[in-house]
Amino acid sequence: MHVEVRADGKVLLATTVALNAAEPVSVAWQKPDALVTITITANGKTIASYTEEKPDQLKKPPVKDPMPLAAEVQSADELYMAGLHVEQYRDPAVMPDAYFLEGLKRDPRHAGCLLGMAAYCYRMALLSEAENYARRAIKRLTKFNARIPSGDAYYQLGLILEAEGKTDEAYDYYRQAAWVGSSVSKAMTRTACIDLARSDYEEAIAHTKQVLTHDAKNPLAPVVLALSYRALGETEKADDVIEAGRQDDCFHMLLRWLSGMSEAHFFSKMDSEPAQTTLDMAFDLLSMGQAAQ
């Protein structure tokens, strides 16, 4: 491949190198004051090109202040937002529950902090505590309106109940969560997974199709759909779903596995970490009642 470096219309470097993704190549030139353009070509075609840009000093984001201690935050709302921030960026120095719990000291019925604690306890496998927080949050949110504008609280409680083995109740809460359009994809995906685990294949297919009308890129929907078709003996439809899904995402590991390829070929083309990838696949299949897969 040919590497060319230019600045102000002048060629600073022109050389041919052998590029290998596993071995970086270093080339040297005298750095000018002007901005540099680096172009890589092969057989007359541009493979890659990069031009330096002068930083825009006016558009630099403001420097963020360090996170305050929970006791230093003024209100329950701010504590809730601080907890969300810590949760989102996974700050190793602090856990989000410190902010949510402090928020609940200020306002024991603060719905956001209650839901934050429900999600936190769920991830920590403190399921009884998680259920308590989630139910308190829903009670608060539905004080004046039974149809709240977000399905997140119902969905979170559904996840907790399903983890506790209370599948029938979880199913009902997933359906309630799906009343809100923004929650249809995730809530009906879990509903369809439970349908499949119950061997209720027609319902699983119907609910999966509902998911796909709201989220065509949902990663679990084609898996549930293909397995349901197979269970009904409709192997051609199942194969079509798997093939279409793999055309859309050639790295979809569950669909690759269900396509029937050999185990050796499956692992030889896996770019992700095998142990974590196979664990993720196993957890998804188990949630569908597909231990045999």
List each language-model region with its residue ranges.
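Long, contiguous interaction/recruitment modules in multidomain scaffold/adaptor proteins
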Residues: M1-Q74, E243-K269
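Residue-level recognition of tetratricopeptide repeat
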Residues: L84-H85, A119, L159, C193, ...
